[in-house]
Amino acid sequence: GVQTCALPISDTQAETKSAILCLVDVPSQAYGRREELLGIHQALAGAVDSYARARLAGHPIVSLLVGKSMSGAFLSHGYQANRIIALKDSGVMVHAMGKESAARVTLRSVDELEQLASSIPPMAYDIESYATLGLLSELLSVENPEQPTNDDLLLAKQAIAQAFKEINAEQSRGLEQRLHGQNRQMSKKVRELLREQWS
């Protein structure tokens, strides 16, 4: 499940804000009528709001994707980070829903869905395709994601430390660096057109 923790009240007044590291392995949030009635949507929105407020208040946030990062669970735990780093491994994926669910929703077989994903990167499940959207700051190639070697741990620690260093050196607390991926050009164009029309 998704867990969040409150930062110390004294930290809100501090000039140097506490760093937040999110380790992300969330297969998805719970689905169902009971969960909706009990307010899972409010819990997820509350988590998103907490992370966004922390980031905007100056807390550097780095997410390390070590497993599945699916649906609302990922949106509420990890997606609001200044930097998202992922392990380059077949077990690490980001998507709105699992393949079987996506196949049902799109009225396709899993095989047809995979064939479609091969030509449309945002539909794909592999982390390399997700990286083309410009949302990841780094892909880490490790020897053994399940049982990391000392070199794997060192690589991850160095990447995380570098990400925090870069965030602290920046003036912006936004997420605009995510708009420059090779497969985000149409999204960027839509934003430009909207900006022109609304100016």
Residue ranges of predicted features:
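Short helix-terminating capping/connector loops at secondary-structure junctions
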Residues: 11-17, 56-58
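Short N-terminal helix-initiation segments at or just after the protein's N-terminus
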Residues: 8-12, 26
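Structural alpha-beta junctions
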Residues: 8, 57-59, 165-169
